[in-house]
């Protein structure tokens, strides 16, 4: 099995690990991200099988131009992995800057919609696969995760709705919903506080970027008559939080 896969957010974490896994398996990989220097480093590592394009997926015009400029050998995209996303801050809603909420919505939702919409004709032609990186936060709320969880719930429902809209086209759509994962994502969430980021995972043995890359490859490797609607995974040391109870004095 081989083909062409486009991965958003390929400059670190899940995206970078997925790029490495698919190149190893003989695929051509298009990696997107904002940090051109990281894409260049990944291209130097992975060779001609990797094509990096630096642009902002929240910008519709930039997205259209970047996809239109793809080299001929990378145009027939078989898999889209919507991985780009972020969480900003750990504070409860009254203490959050509105711009952080807007940034999460723009990146996690608007950017995903831009690139998915532009690639749908190709994915239909190729009878391809759309993999959306959601989160267990789509199901289970946690303190400080209000808007982030809301964006991931959108992704999950969008995945199910997109599959319904593409019924009969041979396109598969999967929502992957990880629990605690240790990547650069958490360092962004904590505003660059390495100690706070490390403490979140202390003693947890969290999911790794390679675990998610292997999961995405497994989804893509299923027979064409099977669609994985959603896939929820957690570290063994993470389970479901109990309800909060406020007790009046």
Swiss-Prot record:
UniProt superkingdom: Bacteria
Binding-site list for NADP(+): 6-30
GO molecular function terms listed in the Swiss-Prot or TrEMBL record: serine 3-dehydrogenase activity
CDD domains linked: SDR_c5 (cd05346)
Catalytic activity: L-serine + NADP(+) = aminoacetaldehyde + CO2 + NADPH
This protein's UniProt keywords: NADP, Oxidoreductase
Keyword check for Oxidoreductase: yes
Active site annotation, chain numbering: 148
Sequence positions that bind substrate: 135
Assembly information from the UniProt record: Homotetramer.
PANTHER family in alphabetical order: ALCOHOL DEHYDROGENASE
Job of this protein: Catalyzes the oxidation of the hydroxyl group of serine to form 2-aminomalonate semialdehyde which is spontaneously converted into 2-aminoacetaldehyde and CO(2). Also acts on D-serine, L-glycerate, D-glycerate and 2-methyl-DL-serine. Does not act on O-methyl-DL-serine and L-threonine.
Protein name: Serine 3-dehydrogenase
Organism whose genome encodes this protein: Agrobacterium fabrum (strain C58 / ATCC 33970) (Agrobacterium tumefaciens (strain C58))
């Amino acid at each position: 099995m081989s083909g062409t896969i486009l991965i958003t957010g390929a400059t670190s974490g899940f995206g970078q690990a997925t790029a490495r896994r698919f190149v190893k398996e003989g695929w051509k990989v298009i990696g997107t991200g904002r940090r051109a220097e990281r894409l260049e480093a990944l291209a130097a590592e992975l060779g001609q099988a990797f094509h990096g394009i630096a642009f902002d997926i929240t910008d519709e015009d930039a997205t259209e131009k970047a996809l239109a400029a793809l080299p001929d050998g990378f145009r027939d995209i078989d898999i889209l992995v919507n991985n780009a996303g972020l969480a900003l801050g750990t504070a409860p809603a009254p203490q959050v800057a509105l711009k952080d909420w807007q940034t999460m919505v723009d990146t996690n939702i608007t950017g995903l919609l831009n690139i998915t919409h532009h690639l749908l004709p190709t994915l239909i032609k190729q009878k391809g696969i759309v993999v959306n990186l959601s989160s267990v936060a789509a199901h289970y709320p946690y303190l400080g995760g209000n808007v982030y969880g809301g964006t991931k719930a959108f992704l999950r429902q969008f995945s199910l709705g997109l599959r319904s809209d593409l019924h009969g086209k041979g396109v598969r759509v999967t929502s992957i919903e990880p629990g605690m994962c240790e990547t650069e994502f958490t360092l962004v969430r904590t505003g660059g506080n390495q100690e706070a980021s490390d403490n979140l995972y202390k003693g947890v043995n969290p999911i790794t970027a390679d675990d998610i890359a292997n999961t995405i490859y497994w989804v893509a490797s299923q027979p064409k008559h099977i669609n994985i609607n959603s896939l929820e995974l957690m570290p063994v040391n993470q389970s479901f939080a109990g309800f909060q109870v406020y007790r009046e004095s």
